Amino acid sequence: MKAYKKEFINFMIECGVLTFGDFVTKSGRKTPFFVNTGNYQTGSQLRRLGEFYAEAIKENFADDYDVLFGPAYKGIPLSVTTSIALSSSFDIDVRYCSNRKEVKDHGDTGILLGSKLNDGDKVLIVEDVTTAGTSIYETMPILKSQADVNVKGLIISVDRMERGQGEQSALTEIREKFGFKTCAIVTMAEVIEYLYNKEINGTILITDEVKGRIDEYYKQYGAK
């Protein structure tokens, strides 16, 4: 496992983003782990988060993109901090934009924030966590309505590796439906591999008991 992936897992734990216990997802699934990206709340945390996204983007997409698109609302700060990190860490100066949930009828009108989209632009979508892929199905018509863009891919922070609308994971469904690359900074398989029986700040987060519950969860909800 790449060093930045291990650092990112530690970072999520430090920020209280990745936790283990008893939770219920929006879809009603009882889950033994939870990824709450709303817990990235400070400037230094957002800076580091952008650096992790930039590292994963460099590995998976090199510099084959013109624009980072962050779907509203959580994707907005992600596209901003990631574009800054790409510039500062890799000298890649990329544009960013996001959509408005509500179209303005005064001042800077239109549905987009940040850069405008042009025909032929290579767009990389930056998201937080995709469980069912709903935001991507909403994003694609928005992008295509603005210009004849070429969507190069989607990157998220954590692939939960759960079934989406069918038997496959949401990322696999999106990749097959739209024909572009999908990837994550880390997968839950990598998280489990790294944390299983490993002491972090004096605590073992994934004990044998927790690992057993995670295994049972994936038997029921894991992607094929």
UniProtKB/Swiss-Prot annotation:
InterPro entries in the cross-refs: OPRT, Or_phspho_trans_dom, PRibTrfase_dom, PRTase-like
Reaction equations catalysed: orotidine 5'-phosphate + diphosphate = orotate + 5-phospho-alpha-D-ribose 1-diphosphate
Binding site for 5-phospho-alpha-D-ribose 1-diphosphate: 26, 73-74, 100-101, 104, 106, 127-135
SUPFAM superfamilies from the UniProt entry: PRTase-like
Pathway listed: Pyrimidine metabolism; UMP biosynthesis via de novo pathway; UMP from orotate: step 1/2
EC number: 2.4.2.10
Keyword field: Glycosyltransferase, Magnesium, Pyrimidine biosynthesis, Transferase
Any one of the GO CC terms: cytoplasm
Chain residues that bind orotate: T131, R160
Keyword Magnesium on entry: yes
Enzyme class label: transferase
Record has Cell inner membrane as a keyword: no
Name of one Pfam family that matches: Pribosyltran
Annotated GO biological process: 'de novo' pyrimidine nucleobase biosynthetic process; 'de novo' UMP biosynthetic process; pyrimidine ribonucleoside biosynthetic process
Necessary cofactors: Mg(2+)
GO terms assigned for molecular function: magnesium ion binding; orotate phosphoribosyltransferase activity
Record text on subunit structure and interactions: Homodimer.
PANTHER family: OROTATE PHOSPHORIBOSYLTRANSFERASE 1-RELATED
Function: Catalyzes the transfer of a ribosyl phosphate group from 5-phosphoribose 1-diphosphate to orotate, leading to the formation of orotidine monophosphate (OMP).
Protein family: Belongs to the purine/pyrimidine phosphoribosyltransferase family. PyrE subfamily.
Protein name: Orotate phosphoribosyltransferase
Species, as recorded: Clostridium beijerinckii (strain ATCC 51743 / NCIMB 8052)
Gene that encodes the chain: pyrE
